[in-house]
Curated annotation (Swiss-Prot):
GO terms for cellular component: DNA-directed RNA polymerase complex. The RNAP catalytic core consists of 2 alpha, 1 beta, 1 beta' and 1 omega subunit. When a sigma factor is associated with the core the holoenzyme is formed, which can initiate transcription. The keyword Metal-binding applies. One of its GO terms (biological process) is DNA-templated transcription. Belongs to the RNA polymerase beta' chain family. The gene is rpoC. The keyword Magnesium applies. Pfam families: RNA_pol_Rpb1_1, RNA_pol_Rpb1_2, RNA_pol_Rpb1_3, RNA_pol_Rpb1_4, RNA_pol_Rpb1_5. This is DNA-directed RNA polymerase subunit beta'. The lineage of its organism: Bacteria, Pseudomonadati, Spirochaetota, Spirochaetia, Spirochaetales. Binds 1 Mg(2+) ion per subunit. It comes from Borrelia recurrentis (strain A1).
Amino acid sequence: MKEIKDFEKIRIKIASPDQIRSWSYGEVKKSETINYRTLRPEKDGLFCERIFGTTKEWECYCGKFKSIRYKGIICDRCNVEVTHFKVRRERMGHIELSAPVAHIWYYKYIPSRIGLLLDITASNLNSILYYEKYIVIEPGDTDLKKMQLLNEDEYSEAKERYGMSFSASMGAEAIKTLLENLDLDELSSKLRLQMIDKDDKTDKKLLRRLEIIENFKISGNKPEWMIMDVLPVIPPEIRPMVQLDGGRFATSDLNDLYRRVINRNNRLRKLLLLNAPEIIVRNEKRMLQESVDSLFDNSHKRKVVKGTSNRPLKSLSDALKGKQGRFRQNLLGKRVDYSGRSVIVVGPELKLHQCGIPAKMALELFKPFVIRKLIESEAVFNIKRAKSLIEQEVDEVWQILDNVIKEHPVLLNRAPTLHRLGIQAFEPVLVEGKAIKLHPLVCHAYNADFDGDQMAVHVPLTPAAQAESWALMLSTNNLLNPANGHPIVFPSQDIVLGLYYLTMERKNVMGEGRKFSNFNHVLLAINNKSLDYNAQIYVKVGEEYIKTTAGRVVFSEALPGKISFVNKTLSDYELQTLISEVYVIYGSSIVIEMLDIIKELGFRYATKFGCTISMSDIIVPQEKKVYVEKANREIAKIQNDYTKGVITGEERYNNVVSVWSKTNEELTNKMMEILKKDRDGFNVIYMMADSGARGSRNQIRQLAGMRGLMAKTSGDIIELPIISNFKEGLSVIEFFISTNGARKGLADTALKTADAGYLTRRLVDIAQDVVVRIEDCGTINGIKVEALKNGEEIIEPLREKAVGSYSIERIKSPITGEIILDVNEEITEDKIKLLETVGIDKLVIRSVLTCEAEHGVCQKCYGRDFSNNKPVSIGEAVGIIAAQSIGQPGTQLTMRTFHIGGVAQAGSEDDKIALKNAFILNGLEGFNVQVDGGLLFTRKGVLRIINVIYEESIKKIKKLKVSDSQKVIKGMSLFIDKSGVEVLSSHIGYIKIKDNKLMIVSEEQEISLKVGTRLEINVGDYVEAGRVIGTFDPFAEPIIAEVKGKIKFKDIILGTTLKEEINLETGNIEKRITDQVFESLDPRILIINDRGVEIASYVLPGDAYLQVEDGQDIDIGDIIAKLSKGSEKTQDITGGLPRVNDLFETRIPKNLTEMAKVSGVVQFKAIQKGKRLINVIDEYGVEHKHYIPAGKHLLVRDGDVVRAGDMLCDGRINPHDVLEILGGISLQEFLLAEIQDVYRKQGVSINDKHIGVIIKQMMKKVKIVSVGDTNFVYNQKVDKHAFYEQNKRVIEQGGEPAVASPILIGITKASLNIDSFISAASFQETTKVLTDASIAGSIDDLRGLKENVVIGHLIPTGTGMNLYKRVKVRENSNSEV
């Protein structure tokens, strides 16, 4: 068989019978395998040497020819060719079937492919193939119809009636005849006409039939090939039979399955020769069909064939499928030689690029290299002698080993390898003992600790592999996290504590207040023990003295020369910032030097500090008792309100939980305050938490404050908190309550790891072929980015979103008019600073989402590679990096956050509105009424405010340099004050002169208000920072009367829509609307005037508590009913990992909201079939219908004006609706924001572009809406680029192009719909993918990584790109000297 190495594509097709025969070296006629006496293969059996080749090298079966010189000769006695025994892995045989048999892949898998072609249901097809029913093939001139099914009796009757004038048959023969008679072209045009007739109502079956027919036409496959006359037999070495110790044989299951087929086939052949009765033959044919089905796919049958130990036999399909299948077990993941594993221990003496390898292990790993050197040095002359020297471990061997490992990198890997930093290269250093030594600073990238973790070592063998390890994988070249560009090599724990101790300041210690003329004098004083590290001193730097501490001088002096003096207490955050800054300014070489110095110093001073903890370090605040008593008083008041019936049970519960949350928070603040003051800040517990070395505020709270609220198994919070802390000790009940949380924590962690791993696998699968392939795709589209704000606070600055991208537009300075950023220019840190100083906070940048590269993405749209802060290089596998960046932090996400009235996780919910900054109220939106001198919002409202960033009294100003409403930037002159000094602006904003004040104000911002908010200010008011401007009820949403009149109940019927419950605790009667839905009843409260005319109407959602009686007088602003927030608790809101899963899989949320399809005016209609019809009337007067389940809480009222995409009722947003209503760009923004929100809440930073890469892959396909003159089928889903290509061709030929709409596909589905069938088959549903690919004659262009790994090519990224494969080195012919 010839070696095929260099091919570019792979095609899969259905094999025709002739092709199967051409592969074969002979027919297998007997089911025998090996002769039990001679242990040689039986002739014509499943292991026959004549067919499959000899079992002994260069020897025929009978032994007449023995030697390589007879190569290729066929023995005249035994007919066996003299060859190498390896041909038994390649040579195939065949079985000539006595009756045609259908292939299980094409008839059994849903949808049945044969069934679709012939338009027969799967069950009918089954009954034909299994000889239960006849099918009419040619009706002739009878009343029968073609393809009509007949049972035995009907067939006999028809035979008697019509004789031979019609033909009907059963079994695979019948199906084969029908398939041979199919005219695909005629069928195709007939179906296309049917689709046009049906138009929008096209059923999926028509679409599927058309797709299959088109696939057969294009691929050149013939439909009748799905029925087999001849069966291939795979080479015997692939289904081996081996002798075990006891003389028994172990055989592959396939041999048993083949034997069943051969036995039944031979029996059928004999029966046919004997002209046996039809019923017996039919039964044998059915059994043959059944045995071939088992051979191809045993697991898919209802009755599985079982082997000796009652275990299902593994068929051909099973060998491909699943984790243990050929794809995932042997092709995508292989075992490696030259590797070892051992426990890791810390190696504080190592340099960053080194690791310690046990001498014994190194000797074994580098054995071939050592042997070579031994032979070269003429210490020995053959390999055998060299091996024995190595076993004796003589001195020369160790010397040679030392030389061999110098500059020969090894790869260290820790499982699980969640991102690319899970494998890094180091230079090995020989160490004693049996443990691998690891540098402490790379632990974070590996997520390793030294509590028994193990790591694997791999040796790169070839010079090319070694060069790649040095250049790309060395730990010193992997300092940054590819997910976000932040340093990933940074100190933690001991090192941080040591440096924090070194750089802290302490009062009243030796040498305080002394002055030193230079750093050396300080070091001298320390060495002479006349100066304490934490003493505050003054040191001359340049011309002036700076206030610092001795420890900071020690730290700064140790750093590499270029780095400026670091004068602050170093916590972990400060150290990371320092590393980041040094990297940006001085580059990686200085950082590497600095990191080793930091490690050294940290360990040394942690040892010097020698911190210990005692019980007396845990200080419980004395005020604890006061706080707890205060909380108990508040709870008594809440209980009292509840007893009186003022609040509902749910509100009481929410309020109690809120009180305890607040109390816990106050107590924690007090406790931290006391700890901070204790021993001048040198309380060890406080130091550990404050430095970020170990422990958190939350953990200290449990030690010295109170443990706080616990959750039940159901996720509800138990309203009785654990008031004790660990120092005081828990009571029995408190201990019992806490056990549940502890157990849940452990169970969750186990589940979470598997889930996060599966998420990563799906992400890698969808993005694995996204590689940077070209420099510039030339797009003119981009996306808008701006700083992400929550009210006033900036959650993510513009810098995080834009740095490293390319601008799509030219940006000029609003003041000078000079160009700051040009089109297609990289946005660097400096450019961002420039933009910030001139007040530009919105940009349009190039993004992977808008990239138009046909395959993968282009350099300009991707921007910067975060692993080295340089523009991304062509060939970078950005899809895999994106998948790893999203999947790796998955284990840190919570499994599910229980949402309980907004507390437990989020602390307490406030009931007041107060803003941090002073502001001016610019305007109000939303329906509100005047009540008691304030404004009451009866529906949701919006405050429009402008923040006051800077203010100065006009009285202090001599001359103004600016005018009202003028824009100012940093450094601009504002005024000259009374003393003649010019004052410059240090802010960006707009000038506002009001109430004798000069102010700089921000752009207008919106703050949303809840229903029932009472506002105490008016438009135009200036409000000081921190003033309470409004109040609301955080635990209930009221329905408020907007007019004065009399209450009238409509459809509120006791026992039907209204439920009266007597509260057993309080004895009060609570009236609640039921959440049952009635066809015609629509419970609402009307307000009527004196004449009995309805002037207002309020729809009551399910679970609303009535606050009024029928016929009662009501005033503006009175509460009619309220909805308790507690009802949200039951609709458990998914957070964390499950939420990310739902978003990537584009699942439709359970509690769906309805979005307005257009902008317009809301009009309420009646309830039909349990759903309320709401029309939105657009500007042209067209009504757009929206159906909302009755009982849902509506967010709009009759007559409201809504915008397209506004939510009409409570619930979660469906991403597919966003795409349909607001378009692709809005959908991308929505998904990006939602996914980032989950990660950001957990403190995980992932750059937008990684999520963008995945979203781009989810939106690769479009759905055909109108076919035009193209070959597409209505409703078909096709690749965007294929769609544009075909349209381009049709337009060039003067035809009408097709029209398509964008669609969103979840990641699992998108991975299966990928162009490469190898990649899709190795992901999931292997057999289904291969079935469809073979019908379509799919060609795999081997563009992605996975396909190439499977077939054993270099992956087409980085150095393996085709770009570099054809590089040849030519000798320069200029030989003149």
